[in-house]
């Protein structure tokens, strides 16, 4: 009986881990979070609606398409915006990185603010989201290399560029995972991380406990098993997707802004 129980428990854990992986990471699975309206597009709720509406119109009317090819062969899309002021300062850029289940449009308000301050603004689509190719979301770990390549696109066209990185939610974690990498060009002079998370593993454990009412031990086991599936399918483990090692090596000024937790903890 004990053996049967063990086999059944192992099977249930494996099934739960597989479900978690597909729900949280696989953007092509029709039952994943990416096909459900679990996260509101406006992460700031009803705040500054007038400004948001103006920014959305500006975003739609002035966006210029741009694209790169990722290191693993995916075509990544983004939008470029000219400064929206009379006498912009040359060579200053802001890259606004959207979050989990998001799109560049969710950064419209911030992109417009930076453009009005004289920045040339880039708002990329994260891999496997919006217009960019890919199937699996990297929780910032895979996306950090994509962000480095977007930075390189700017630096290659303007070697005097001074770049500000801004990210919200998973975009904030992408920024944090990028700032401490040895490849980061000196052109990146500052970063802002809004409502990011430090570890994908801990984020998923907290989410599993909150959404599915799992005990902590079971949630940890399920997430760790899902991480093994993720390693095989997407090329990374949830334990790798942590910004703490990067932040230890970050030397540029960085502002951290912590807001209320979003649904699914992201």
Question: What positions do the PLM features span?
Answer:
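Serine-hydrolase catalytic core
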Residues: 68-70, 76, 224, 230-266
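Alpha/beta-hydrolase active-site loop
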Residues: 137-158
């Amino acid at each position: 009986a004990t053996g049967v129980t063990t086999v059944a428990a192992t099977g249930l854990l494996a099934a739960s881990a597989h479900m978690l992986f597909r729900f949280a990471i696989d953007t092509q699975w029709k039952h994943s979070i990416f096909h459900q309206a679990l996260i509101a597009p406006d992460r700031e709720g009803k705040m500054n609606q007038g400004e948001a509406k103006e920014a959305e119109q500006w975003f739609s009317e002035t966006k210029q398409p741009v694209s790169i090819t990722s290191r693993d062969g995916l075509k990544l899309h983004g939008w470029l915006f000219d400064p929206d002021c009379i006498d912009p300062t040359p060579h200053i850029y802001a890259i606004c990185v959207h979050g989990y289940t998001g799109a560049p449009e969710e950064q419209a308000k911030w992109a417009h603010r930076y453009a009005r301050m004289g920045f040339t603004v880039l708002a990329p689509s994260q891999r496997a989201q919006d217009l960019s190719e890919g199937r699996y979301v990297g929780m910032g770990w895979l996306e950090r290399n994509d962000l480095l390549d977007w930075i390189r696109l700017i630096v290659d066209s303007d070697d005097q560029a001074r770049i500000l990185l801004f990210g919200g939610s998973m975009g904030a974690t992408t920024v944090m995972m990028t700032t401490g990498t040895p490849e980061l060009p000196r052109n990146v002079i500052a970063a802002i991380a809004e409502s990011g998370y430090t570890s994908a593993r801990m984020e998923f454990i907290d989410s599993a406990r909150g959404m599915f009412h799992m005990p902590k031990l079971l949630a940890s086991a399920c997430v760790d098993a899902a991480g093994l599936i993720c390693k095989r399918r997407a090329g990374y483990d949830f334990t790798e997707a942590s910004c703490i090692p990067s932040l230890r090596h970050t030397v540029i000024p960085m502002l951290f802004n912590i807001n209320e937790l979003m649904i699914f903890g992201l």
